[in-house]
Amino acid sequence: MGILNKIFGTYSERELRRVNPIVNKIEALDEKMQSLKDEDFKLKTEEFKSRLEKGEKLDDILPEAFALVREAAHRTIGLKHYREQLIGGVVLHQGRIGEMKTGEGKTLVATLPAYVNALTGKGVHIVTVNDYLAKRDRDLMAPVYEFLGLKVGVILHNLNNEERQEAYGSDITYGTNSEFGFDYLRDNMVVYKEERVQRKLNFSIVDEVDSILIDEARTPLIISGQGEKSTEFYKVADYFTKSLIAEKDFTIDEKANSAMLTDEGVNKAENFFKVDNYADAENMEIQHHVVQALKANYVMKKDKDYMIKDGEILIVDEFTGRAMEGRRYSDGLHQAIEAKEGVRVERESKTLATITYQNYFRMYNKLSGMTGTAQTEENEFREIYGLDVIVIPTHEPIARIDNADVVYKSEKGKFKAIVDEIVERYKKGQPMLVGTVSIEKSEMLSSMLKKKGVPHQVLNAKYHEKEAEIISHAGEYGMVTIATNMAGRGTDIKLTKEAEEAGGLMIIGTERHESRRIDNQLRGRSGRQGDPGESRFFVSLEDDLMRIFGSERIQGIVDKLGLAEDEAIESKMVSSAIESAQKKVEGNNFDIRKTLLQYDDVINKQREIIYKQRSEVLEGEDLKDQIRDMIRDVVYTAVNSHISGVEEEFETELQNLVNYLEDICLPKALVKVKDISNLSDEEIKEKLLEAVENIYSNKEKEIGEEQIREIERVILLRVVDTKWMDHIDDMDHLKQGIGLRAYRQQDPVQAYQFEGSEMFEEMIYNIKVDTVRYLFHVEVEKAPEREKVAKETSTNYDEDSVKKQPIKKENRIGRNDLCPCGSGKKYKNCCGRMA
């Protein structure tokens, strides 16, 4: 591979050779654009739109359009895209990922493809990781777009529906991945089409694309309502788990991040919970609570995985070190942690709507992305999203010096060496950014530096409100900044002249992350736009990566050398062993994400069908034919399922059939068994269908054409939403237990696909049955009103939260409340009779 690259160039180099002629055309138009008057820019936009309407393609107008944006940026914000940024713009327009190093002006690059694709009138979404960056980027670039005659909006978490509609109606919309995803889910829960906020998903430019499409890929967006289970069991399981002895009663698997009972632990569980067989299926709930309590107490670490703030458990994002308010672990783990820490245990939630980022972003007609680090995950981008990665050359050569890793025997020796290094460089005024993997480690390092009298600033989940401000000062003379992982990503670290003379920004990594990409991101904070800088990672054999995934070979080398605690080893062999450990973990994580996607694809196809049907109900003026089809399906299926063809049982089967249909759509005693006992199966179907259709026709006349059509819509929406929410729950339960199928020589994914498909077909039939049942029992005294099955009671999340979960509460109808179908009767005397 290396020899071929030397002869033909890398994939990126070959692709860039194709892009260069386009960039030459853009640069050649520079003089022409400079000669335009300010008022000509809006006219050019109208001209481009007109040319597109007449059949020209975006690629035909691209050179001129890019050149126009370039000049507009120069006149409005004083920035002119340089050649490398033009290359980046072309790559994004082509629906690819552009790897652009920190400080290369990604925000400015996005204006080029955003403008060109907005000319179609279908909208462009520019996606970033938090509200601060979305608003900042929109405010910075709005003058450029507005000068060109385009409207630009931003989606922030505190906007109301009208403001969201206006922002999405803009030509270009900035916002966070979670806001875009949640708005899609909410749009598919509305009861009037006018309440929707998003248009069809057209073109998306994802900033920090690796963070959103890979780090976040395993995290589903969930809109949830309050569950009904008691929380007492979590406290009981926690009490039991705290009485166990490590290794004797339970074991911990650090690679799998899990804990499980030993045989001795199982005996203790059976005695404690007073059950004969802990593994019995009827004790599944006990098993579930014990497993989560074990994980909460012995795997999840305070100030690393979560933190406590004002009596609330907040998840800490492992990639950014941010606390994610409003987001909760699913499947009872959050409740188990609450029980462990002695804070109030909240009830488990019920999922009302959910989607993963993988499936949300794959719905766009065209997807592109920017990041400083994508190449290490190129295979995943290509395989899952169909995106290739093109490395964009830097404007200035990178002057940063990346030193080899230094490896210590113990963590204590490593941190002592880090502090010595910081003290040494602080004396000469060199600014330093020190990356840690957890709040706990950053606070430990902070206290060590305080003892040495080194002034510094700490940036972790506890102080993220000041994130951008803290990080922007990190390049000043003598400034020492300790930050958890990728905190402050998206904010440039600019060097002062004195800091530059002191050697530029020094990056110190206190531990290797399990992903090379995260390490590269930390390194990339230094050496922006040709600035001087340096980086070095300090590693110990006690670090998680080395301990869990590192090879025994490294341990062997260190043992042979007989290193003391504070002695270091620096060798290429050690560095390559570390890299192979990282590759092993990355491959493992990719496989996990691929498998999860296979599961999610099952429910994703089902989601698309349900949301499409829902949309047709909202859009359609008349559901008459659809309802008639449902009535026929219910009657025909009832006949097929009740009549077996066994003569001796025919009379009994007919009676059961009549009873069944009387519960759904036939008035009592309208059809008697003797009326149909001499008919064939097909004649029975026709006779029953005729009777049922006549009843419905009379109901239409009685209620009135206009009113019955709205009632059909109200009832169908309500039934679809209720059944879909229950189905999500059922699919979740199926997935939780499906892994055990491997013991039966069954492929769990295939079993999930097959059984999930059967459950979906059953749900579709039940939607028909319930819709018909409600329609035949409805009596109207006032005009019906549509009502959401789930009402949003609060959206408790922080603007920087990457994985937000609005807490939505299911709207329960009291038995004495008015029935939502619009009959004017109490629920218990109307639709509640069938509930």
UniProtKB/Swiss-Prot annotation:
Membrane topology: Peripheral membrane protein
Cofactors that this protein relies on: Zn(2+)
Locations listed in the record: Cell membrane; Cytoplasm
A matching Pfam family: SEC-C
Predominant location: membrane
Catalytic activity: ATP + H2O + cellular proteinSide 1 = ADP + phosphate + cellular proteinSide 2
Keyword presence, DNA-binding: no
GO function term, MF aspect, one: protein-exporting ATPase activity
Any one GO CC term of the record: plasma membrane
Signal peptide (residue range): none
Cofactor details (free text): May bind 1 zinc ion per subunit.
Family in the record: Belongs to the SecA family.
Subunit structure as annotated in this protein's UniProt entry: Monomer and homodimer. Part of the essential Sec protein translocation apparatus which comprises SecA, SecYEG and auxiliary proteins SecDF. Other proteins may also be involved.
Name of the protein: Protein translocase subunit SecA
Organism: Clostridium botulinum (strain 657 / Type Ba4)
